[in-house]
Amino acid sequence: MPKTISVRVTTMDAELEFAIQPNTTGKQLFDQVVKTIGLREVWFFGLQYQDTKGFSTWLKLNKKVTAQDVRKESPLLFKFRAKFYPEDVSEELIQDITQRLFFLQVKEGILNDDIYCPPETAVLLASYAVQSKYGDFNKEVHKSGYLAGDKLLPQRVLEQHKLNKDQWEERIQVWHEEHRGMLREDAVLEYLKIAQDLEMYGVNYFSIKNKKGSELWLGVDALGLNIYEQNDRLTPKIGFPWSEIRNISFNDKKFVIKPIDKKAPDFVFYAPRLRINKRILALCMGNHELYMRRRKPDTIEVQQMKAQAREEKHQKQMERAMLENEKKKREMAEKEKEKIEREKEELMERLKQIEEQTKKAQQELEEQTRRALELEQERKRAQSEAEKLAKERQEAEEAKEALLQASRDQKKTQEQLALEMAELTARISQLEMARQKKESEAVEWQQKAQMVQEDLEKTRAELKTAMSTPHVAEPAENEQDEQDENGAEASADLRADAMAKDRSEEERTTEAEKNERVQKHLKALTSELANARDESKKTANDMIHAENMRLGRDKYKTLRQIRQGNTKQRIDEFESM
C-alpha cells in the first residue's frame, strides 16, 4: 500500500490535518476540506501554497497535489482562502460559514493594511467585529480591558492618533453598545457590507506596463479590469467590465485582451514574468464566470441553499426572540426582587424607627409618671401640713378662748392677759400666713400635677398609635482558502450572452450612502477622531482618500466615471498613460 502524505490546511479560524495518497488530485483534497468545514459555496475558494521559489500559488484542482511545485516538507502546507470575491455580500454569500470566512479574511487584510481603510471606518468596523465576537455589551461581563487581547485597528490608524489603548477601547466600546440586539451573524454581514465599499476590497493588483513602457497597476476584481497609476491604487483611471471582453490570451510576458467591440483595438499590456500572466488569466476566467453566473437565474442548488439559509436565519431569530423574552422576564423578576428587597429594607428601617420612637415615648411616659408621683406626694405633704396648721390654729383659737374664759374666770391681771393675748394673736397671724402659703403651694402643685397628667395622657395616646402600626412581614421572594514556466502562451474565450448587458453594478451606492445609521456613525467618528489626529503622520493613501472625499467620489461613482466612452476611447486612453 502506497505511503500516505501528511497535509495541513489552515483556514481563517482552524487547522485541519489530512493524510492523502500520492495520486490525490487538488480537487480531491479541496473537496475533503470543504466537506470537513461544511462549506457549500465552494466557487469562491481555493487552496494556496508557497512554491519552491517562495511565490504564493493556487493549487490546480485538475492535477495531482504531488505533481505541483509544492515545497516538499512534512506536512505539506496549504491555506484555504477566498480566491474570488462577490459583487454584493448580502445578495451572494448564503451560508454563515461563507460569510465568516470572508469576514476573517477581509478583516485580516484591513488590519495588515493590505486593504486601505480610513480611521473612522476602521473604528466602526472594529465595533462590528467586537459584536460578532462578544455579542451584546454587558457591563457586568465586559469590564475595563476586555478588548486588550484583540487586534482591532490597523497599526497606521493607531500611530496617527494621540490616543492610548484605554481611550481606543472606550471609543470602540461606545459603538459596541450601539449594536445591542444584533445577532453575531448579522454583525459579520454588516462588517462585510461596509468593507466591500472600500476601494481596495476584492482587488488583485498586478504590476504591468503599456506599450509606452509606463509603470501601471492592473486591478482584477469581480466587476472587471481596472487600470491604476503607479502611485495611486485607490482610484482607478480606466475600467473595462467583463461584459466588454471577448477573449483573453498571453504569449510569454505579453497579455492581450480582445474586446467584444470589433472596431476597438486589442488591449495589450506586459507583465514582468510569465507566471504573472498565468495568474491574471486564471483570475480573469474565474471572475468572468462568476460575473456571468450572477446575471442568470439561480441554479436549483443555490435556490435550495438560500431557502435553507432563510429557514436557519428565521429559526435563529425565533430563538433569539425567545431568549430575549426570557431575558426580559428574568430581568423583570430581578427588578421585582430588588424592589421587594428595597421595600423590605425600607419597612424594616421604618419599623426600627417606630420602635425607637416607641421606646423613647415609653421612657418619657415613665419619666412623666415618676414626676407625677413626686408631685402628688408633694401635694399630699403640703396638704397634710396645711391641715396640721389648720388644726394648730384651731387649737390656738380654742386656747385663746380658754384664756379669755380663764381671764374672766380667774381674773388675771390685765397686763398678763394682754401679754398672752398679744402673743397668741401674733402666733395666730403667723399660722394664718403659713397656712395661706401652704394652700398656695398646694394649688401650685395641683396645677403642675394636672399638666403632667395631660402630658401623660397625650404620650399614652401617641404610644397607643405607634404600638397599633401593623408589624411588616418579610415579602416572599420571586422564584423565579502558475508556477509552471513552461507553456508560454494560453488563451481563453469569455462567452457572453444577453445577460452580459446587465451592468447594474454601475448603479450601486455605498452602504454609508443608503444606510442613514452607518452614515451618522461615520460622521460622528470623523468628528470625534479629528481632535486626536496627528496630521504629520498622514500616508499617501490618506491624502488620496481625503481628496476623493473632497471631490465627492466613492468606489461606485468612480466606476461609472472610468467606464464612460466606448471601448476604443478607453483603450486609447490606456495607451497614452
Curated annotation (Swiss-Prot):
Family matches, as Gene3D superfamilies: 1.20.5.450, 1.20.80.10, 6.10.360.10, Phosphatidylinositol 3-kinase Catalytic Subunit, Chain A, domain 1, Pleckstrin-homology domain (PH domain)/Phosphotyrosine-binding domain (PTB)
Protein name (Swiss-Prot/TrEMBL): Moesin
Phosphotyrosine: residues bearing it: Y116
Compositionally biased intervals (Basic and acidic residues): 375-401, 492-518
Modified residues (S-nitrosocysteine): C117
Residues the record lists as N6-acetyllysine modifications: K79, K139, K165
Mod. after translation: Phosphorylation on Thr-558 is crucial for the formation of microvilli-like structures. Phosphorylation by ROCK2 suppresses the head-to-tail association of the N-terminal and C-terminal halves resulting in an opened conformation which is capable of actin and membrane-binding. Phosphorylation on Thr-558 by STK10 negatively regulates lymphocyte migration and polarization. S-nitrosylation of Cys-117 is induced by interferon-gamma and oxidatively-modified low-densitity lipoprotein (LDL(ox)) implicating the iNOS-S100A8/9 transnitrosylase complex.
Record text on activity regulation: A head-to-tail association, of the N-terminal and C-terminal halves results in a closed conformation (inactive form) which is incapable of actin or membrane-binding.
Gene that encodes the chain: MSN
Chain location of the short sequence motif [IL]-x-C-x-x-[DE] motif per the record: 115-120
Cited InterPro entries: Band_41_domain, ERM, ERM_C_dom, ERM_FERM_C, ERM_helical, Ez/rad/moesin-like, FERM/acyl-CoA-bd_prot_sf, FERM_2
Phosphothreonine PTM positions: T558
BP GO annotations: cellular response to testosterone stimulus; establishment of endothelial barrier; establishment of epithelial cell apical/basal polarity; gland morphogenesis; immunological synapse formation; leukocyte cell-cell adhesion; leukocyte migration; membrane to membrane docking
Annotated SUPFAM superfamilies: Moesin tail domain, PH domain-like, Second domain of FERM, Ubiquitin-like
Membrane topology listed for this record: Peripheral membrane protein
Keyword terms of this UniProt record: Acetylation, Cell membrane, Cell projection, Cytoplasm, Cytoskeleton, Disease variant, Host-virus interaction, Membrane, Phosphoprotein, S-nitrosylation
Keyword Cell membrane tagged: yes
Organism the protein comes from: Homo sapiens
Residue intervals of the FERM domain: 2-295
Region feature (Disordered): 323-342, 375-409, 466-518
Residues modified as Phosphoserine: S74, S407, S527
Gene Ontology CC: one annotated term: focal adhesion
Comment text on domains: The [IL]-x-C-x-x-[DE] motif is a proposed target motif for cysteine S-nitrosylation mediated by the iNOS-S100A8/A9 transnitrosylase complex.
Effect of R171W: In IMD50; decreased protein abundance in T cell; loss of T cell proliferation after T cell activation; does not affect immunologic synapses formation; decreased T cell migration in response to activation by chemokines; increased T cell adhesion in response to activation by integrins
Disease: Immunodeficiency 50: A primary immunodeficiency disorder characterized by onset of recurrent bacterial or varicella zoster virus infections in early childhood, profound lymphopenia, hypogammaglobulinemia, fluctuating monocytopenia and neutropenia, and a poor immune response to vaccine antigens.
Tissue-level expression: In all tissues and cultured cells studied.
Listed Acidic residues bias regions: 476-487
Gene Ontology MF terms in the entry: actin binding; cell adhesion molecule binding; double-stranded RNA binding; enzyme binding; protein kinase binding; signaling receptor binding; structural constituent of cytoskeleton
